[in-house]
């Protein structure tokens, strides 16, 4: 039992350590192996075999399984960014809601792009100019901007029913569930998340105005899309195709993203600055590797945690439990 307690303590310390170090901007590529090493030592596992074998295998398995999704999602997002299609979607949402509903407009703009399969790290750059303009019209401090944009793309849009994002895809492949698993609870939770995010951000905006804070333009300004942009309907077509194909057919997310890319190239060809295409694709490829490696190094820690005495004890305890399966899960 002592080894189980030590193992559990090691996992807890590793999780806390990862949280603190990552918030202090230490690279996950460094944090992941260190956390795995700590758990290995405190669990009494063979250090060399666990770190160079189990950990590296966990990292490699995640990379091999999901690299194409990250790459194609980045390319699709980059096409939306350089063509101005992402900005067009943002402008359309702004027209629907106006500056008075700044937080709602920013949230929905980010969520729409996320539900279209675009990588979240691309969405930030695509939405930023539109969100900044909204914040200027609403006279809100810009430090609130990342919160509402991330709230739109990293919460319900990443985990909700029908989402083609990596969180949903991993669940589908690991558990064999459809994209709409837990449809009613998932939709209800998504609505609750969206409402609470908007409520909280509006509350913070009201407090900021009460303190006399105002919009301050960023140094150096923001690069705006120059040249013609696709029409509103045309801008929505590739994203809609990805969502529909992902949920209605069985061709897989990689094929869906490829179709989205082909549609984007065909529909946005007049708006794409072809002289920038090579550098854009190189940047998309490079950033996709960075993102997936950062994620995979943390996933590798989970592979090591699975072979610890504490994990085996916890699984046995939960499997023998008579509690509600949802609570146990």
Question: Which residue stretches match the model-derived regions?
Answer:
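Interfacial loop-to-helix junctions that mark the boundaries of transmembrane helices
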Residues: 1-6, 23-25, 52-64, 177-186, ...
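Structural signal for alpha-helical transmembrane segments and their membrane-water exit/capping regions
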Residues: 2-10, 17-50, 72-84, 242-275, ...
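Long, contiguous bundles of hydrophobic transmembrane helices that form the permeation core
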Residues: 2-11, 15, 184-280
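Transmembrane alpha-helix interface/packing and boundary motifs in multi-pass membrane proteins
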Residues: 18-25, 77, 110-118, 152-158, ...
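Transmembrane helix boundary and interhelical junction motifs in multipass membrane proteins
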Residues: 30, 115-131, 144-145, 160-167
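Membrane-embedded alpha-helical segments and adjacent helix-loop junctions characteristic
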Residues: 48-137, 274-329
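Membrane-core helix-loop-helix motifs of multi-pass transport proteins
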Residues: 133-229
């Amino acid at each position: 039992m002592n080894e189980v307690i030590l193992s559990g303590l090691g996992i807890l310390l590793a999780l806390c350590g990862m949280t603190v170090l990552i918030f202090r901007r230490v690279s996950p590529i460094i944090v992941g192996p260190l956390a795995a090493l700590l758990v290995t030592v405190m669990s009494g596992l063979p250090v060399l075999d666990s770190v160079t074998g189990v950990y590296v295998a966990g990292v490699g398995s995640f990379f091999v399984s999901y690299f194409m999704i990250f790459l194609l999602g980045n390319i699709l997002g980059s096409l939306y960014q350089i063509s101005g299609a992402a900005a067009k979607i943002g402008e359309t949402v702004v027209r629907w809601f106006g500056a008075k509903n700044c937080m709602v407009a920013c949230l929905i703009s980010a969520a729409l792009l996320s539900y279209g399969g675009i990588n979240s790290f691309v969405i930030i750059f695509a939405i930023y100019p539109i969100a900044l303009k909204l914040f200027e019209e609403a006279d809100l401090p810009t430090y609130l901007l990342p919160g509402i944009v991330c709230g739109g793309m990293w919460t319900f849009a990443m985990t909700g029913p029908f989402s083609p994002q990596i969180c949903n895809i991993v669940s589908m492949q690991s558990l064999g569930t459809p994209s709409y698993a837990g449809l009613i609870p998932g939709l209800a939770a998504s609505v609750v998340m969206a409402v609470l995010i908007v409520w909280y951000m509006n509350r913070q905006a009201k407090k900021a105005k009460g303190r006399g804070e105002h919009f301050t333009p960023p140094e150096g300004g923001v690069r705006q899309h120059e040249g013609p942009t696709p029409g509103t309907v045309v801008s929505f077509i590739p994203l809609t195709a990805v969502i529909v194909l992902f949920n209605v057919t069985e061709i897989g997310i990689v094929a869906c993203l490829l179709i989205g890319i082909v549609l984007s190239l065909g529909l946005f060809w007049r708006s794409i600055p072809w002289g920038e295409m090579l550098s854009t694709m190189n940047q998309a490829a490079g950033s996709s590797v960075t993102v997936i490696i950062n994620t995979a190094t943390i996933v590798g820690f989970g592979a090591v945690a699975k072979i610890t005495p504490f994990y085996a004890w916890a699984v046995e305890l939960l499997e023998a439990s008579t509690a509600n399966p949802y609570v146990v899960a």
